[in-house]
Swiss-Prot record:
Optimum temperature is 81 degrees Celsius. Thermostable up to 100.8 degrees Celsius. Poorly active at 25 degrees Celsius. Enzymatic activity is increased 4-fold by temperature increase from 25 to 45 degrees Celsius and more than 9-fold at 98 degrees Celsius. The keyword Hydrolase applies. Optimum pH is 4.7-5.7. Signal peptide: none annotated. This is Acylphosphatase. Coiled coil: none annotated. It comes from the Archaea. Belongs to the acylphosphatase family. InterPro entries: Acylphosphatase (IPR020456), Acylphosphatase-like_dom (IPR001792), Acylphosphatase-like_dom_sf (IPR036046), Acylphosphatase_CS (IPR017968). Residues 15-101 form the Acylphosphatase-like domain. PANTHER family: ACYLPHOSPHATASE. Its EC number is 3.6.1.7. The active site is at R30, N48.
Length: 101
């Protein structure tokens, strides 16, 4: 069994920024993202923006973030996700849980 070094574990941790467009406000989208994020051990937030989009900032293991991104692209049944812009960057460790705003 491989023993991971602190550096290797830290390198597996990432930050994801996503901006979700379409019918994503007033349809339970943020709660949907929060539920899946918590199940995947991801911390961060989902926030409604004035232009009708939703901003998601999430931190966790890269594999878990990729799974969350797939859920975001699907959205809950009442949502109509038209486009998701996203990027991955360096883990910052600034969140304690996953919030919605």
């Amino acid at each position: 069994m491989k023993k991971w070094s602190d550096t290797e574990v830290f390198e597996m941790l990432k930050r994801m920024y996503a901006r979700v467009y379409g019918l994503v406000q007033g349809v339970g989208f943020r709660k949907f993202v929060q539920i899946h994020a918590i199940r995947l051990g991801i911390k961060g937030y989902a926030k409604n923006l004035p232009d009708g989009s939703v901003e998601v900032v999430a931190e966790g293991y890269e594999e878990a973030l990729s799974k969350l991104l797939e859920r975001i692209k699907q959205g809950p049944p009442a949502a109509e996700v038209e486009k998701v812009d996203y990027s991955f960057s360096e883990y910052k460790g600034e969140f304690e849980d996953f919030e919605t705003y």
